[in-house]
Amino acid sequence: MRCPFCHSDNDKVQDSRTAEAGYVVRRKRLCQTCQRRFTTLEQIDALNVRVVKSDETREPFDREKIKRGIERACSKRAVTSDEIEKTVQKIEEAIYAEFDMEIPTATIGEVVLRKLATLDEVAYIRFASVYRDFDDAKDFLQIVSNLQRDAETEGR
């Protein structure tokens, strides 16, 4: 690994730890040339799952798009970045467990909605309004009544 400070490739790993439920390895390194410390993160290369968009075009699955969408939905809410990261991880795990080649964007959206419903109801409504392209207030009222019905069914 090249040192980000002196660009030497002479470094030593001082500590390794797993992070993000074991899907990431965090390594603390010491450059043997300039003696400065830096940290690297190793994670599994995304499997070759392709996303099938509504116009039938395909693109590689990108967890960062999901994360950005959830961050927008959770903006100014009492949801920590750690909770967002864990939610994205659960979504990614669900996708990789069920799909090995292609996944429609509609399916990704539904998985995200299911996870957001348990994370934060306002974030769920915000995401749903964009994902389902709400036209007017009745769309919002419908989703709120669905949330209330589900909460009563689950005894919340």
Swiss-Prot record:
Intrachain S-S bonds: none
GO molecular function: ATP binding; double-stranded DNA binding; zinc ion binding
UniProt record, GO biological process: negative regulation of DNA-templated transcription
Cofactor(s), by name: Zn(2+)
InterPro entries: ATP-cone_dom, NrdR-like_N, RNR_NrdR-like
Pfam families reported for this sequence: ATP-cone, Zn_ribbon_NrdR
Keyword ATP-binding: yes
Positions of the ATP-cone domain: 49-139
ZnF (unnamed) intervals: 3-34
Similarity-based family: Belongs to the NrdR family.
Function as written in the Swiss-Prot or TrEMBL entry: Negatively regulates transcription of bacterial ribonucleotide reductase nrd genes and operons by binding to NrdR-boxes.
Official protein name in the record: Transcriptional repressor NrdR
